[in-house]
């Protein structure tokens, strides 16, 4: 991905600094919400540059907070910037930015996990999935507490071509806890290789752009932060329903230090577990003694394809949840323990 060499020609007028905005409105980061403010405009400008050219692009910023990255985006000559902020304390500071950039900044008080963006931008900017990405870009300094559920939600949106991806293969430039960023780009065999690696990489081209030291944030988090760029692929590397892929991958990685047959076995009811797991691995041509971290995307493609066929043969298989079976067994065991006849009374 080629990064834009410089920010756009539009410049905001002189404004209070982000630090002054924080002081002016009495803002403070809420630890329970994993809030950390990025005050250095050189770093926010770098995030925007690494996102690529945003000239005449419709940008959706999630969690703008006091507006550090927001300023850098506005200075990139965007067509329009839509920000969605859940915390009402930040709205007055963002409104100040909106007043300084008439017609450029739209503020929505809402939750990014539930906000419907499908009709937020003009319909004429939509592109076919096979075409180049549309002039829409998602940018955000994500709170650690929502980053993983949010990216999983967006990955499912990609698979369905809905949500932010009704416009086409919308690009994303997002911050994550460094460990999460490393998992998103991890290669087969690395210790960071995980469920998140497979789920992201089967649907997107994923690039870890750079790392921001924790000391750059206020308050300083205990970890560094990674900036990640994701571009949806024209064709997913696994052509099965998202929920099916997610189920196979989740089960495979739940016992990441054991052989892969251990976790994959949890896809099947106990009565048929040994036989069905053996059949799955044999048909997928996978060594049952491989560790989950050594299962590649192509391994998971084979596993998902075979598991889909097994589900087609036995439709109840897809809805099977080993935790539910375990819960039922425990419940029956407790009932038996409490039965007077079973206790000899």
UniProtKB/Swiss-Prot annotation:
This is Dimethyladenosine transferase 1, mitochondrial. Residues 1-27 form a transit peptide. It is found in: Mitochondrion. Ubiquitously expressed. Keywords: DNA-binding, Methyltransferase, Mitochondrion, RNA-binding, rRNA processing, S-adenosyl-L-methionine, Transcription, Transcription regulation, Transferase, Transit peptide. Disruption phenotype: Mutant homozygous mice exhibit embryonic lethality. Conditional loss of Tfb1m in heart, leads to loss of dimethylation on adenosine(1006)/adenosine(1007) of 12S rRNA, decreases steady-state levels of 12S rRNA, induces instability of the small subunit of the ribosome and abolishes mitochondrial translation. S-adenosyl-L-methionine binds at residues 38, 63, 85-86, 111-112, 141. PROSITE patterns: RRNA_A_DIMETH, SAM_RNA_A_N6_MT. It is an enzyme of class 2 (transferase). Gene3D superfamilies: Ribosomal RNA adenine dimethylase-like, domain 2, Vaccinia Virus protein VP39. Mitochondrial methyltransferase which uses S-adenosyl methionine to dimethylate two highly conserved adjacent adenosine residues (A1006 and A1007) within the loop of helix 45 at the 3-prime end of 12S rRNA, thereby regulating the assembly or stability of the small subunit of the mitochondrial ribosome. Also required for basal transcription of mitochondrial DNA, probably via its interaction with POLRMT and TFAM. Stimulates transcription independently of the methyltransferase activity. GO terms for molecular function: DNA binding; RNA binding; rRNA (adenine-N6,N6-)-dimethyltransferase activity; S-adenosyl-L-methionine binding. Interacts with mitochondrial RNA polymerase POLRMT. Interacts with TFAM. Remains bound to the maturing mtSSU until the late stages of assembly. The gene is Tfb1m. It catalyses: adenosine(N)/adenosine(N+1) in rRNA + 4 S-adenosyl-L-methionine = N(6)-dimethyladenosine(N)/N(6)-dimethyladenosine(N+1) in rRNA + 4 S-adenosyl-L-homocysteine + 4 H(+). InterPro entries: KsgA/Erm, rRNA_Ade_diMease-like_C, rRNA_Ade_Mease_Trfase_CS, rRNA_Ade_methylase_Trfase_N, rRNA_adenine_dimethylase, SAM-dependent_MTases_sf. It comes from Mus musculus (Mouse). GO terms for biological process: rRNA methylation. CDD domains: AdoMet_MTases.
């Amino acid at each position: 991905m080629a990064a834009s060499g410089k920010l756009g020609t539009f410049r905001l007028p002189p404004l209070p600094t982000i630090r002054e905005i924080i002081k002016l409105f009495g803002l403070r980061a809420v630890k329970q919400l994993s809030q950390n403010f990025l005050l250095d405009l050189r770093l926010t400008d770098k995030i925007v540059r690494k996102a690529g050219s945003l000239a005449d692009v419709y940008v959706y910023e999630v969690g703008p907070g006091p507006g550090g990255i927001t300023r850098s985006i506005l200075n990139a000559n965007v067509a329009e910037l839509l920000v969605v902020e859940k915390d009402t304390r930040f709205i007055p500071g963002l409104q100040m930015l909106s007043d300084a950039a008439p017609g450029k900044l739209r503020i929505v008080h809402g939750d990014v996990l539930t906000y419907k963006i499908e009709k937020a931008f003009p319909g004429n900017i939509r592109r076919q999935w096979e075409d180049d990405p549309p002039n829409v870009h998602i940018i955000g300094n994500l709170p650690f507490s929502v980053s993983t559920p949010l990216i999983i939600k967006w990955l499912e949106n990609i698979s369905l071509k809905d949500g932010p991806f009704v416009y086409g293969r919308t690009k994303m430039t997002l911050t994550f806890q460094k460990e999460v960023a490393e998992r998103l780009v991890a290669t087969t065999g690395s210790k960071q290789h995980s469920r998140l690696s497979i789920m992201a990489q089967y649907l997107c081209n994923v690039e870890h752009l750079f790392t921001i030291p924790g000391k750059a944030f206020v308050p300083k988090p205990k970890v560094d932060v990674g900036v990640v760029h994701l571009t949806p692929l024209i064709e997913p590397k696994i052509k099965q329903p998202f929920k099916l892929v997610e189920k196979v991958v989740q089960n495979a990685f739940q016992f990441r230090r054991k052989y892969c047959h251990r976790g994959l076995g949890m896809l099947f009811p106990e009565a048929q577990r040994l036989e069905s797991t053996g059949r799955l691995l044999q048909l997928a041509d996978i060594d049952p003694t491989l560790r989950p971290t050594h299962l590649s995307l192509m391994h998971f493609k084979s596993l998902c394809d075979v598991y889909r066929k097994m589900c087609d043969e036995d439709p109840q298989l897809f809805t099977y949840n080993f935790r539910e079976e375990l819960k039922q067994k425990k419940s029956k065991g407790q009932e038996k323990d409490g039965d007077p006849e079973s206790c000899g009374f």
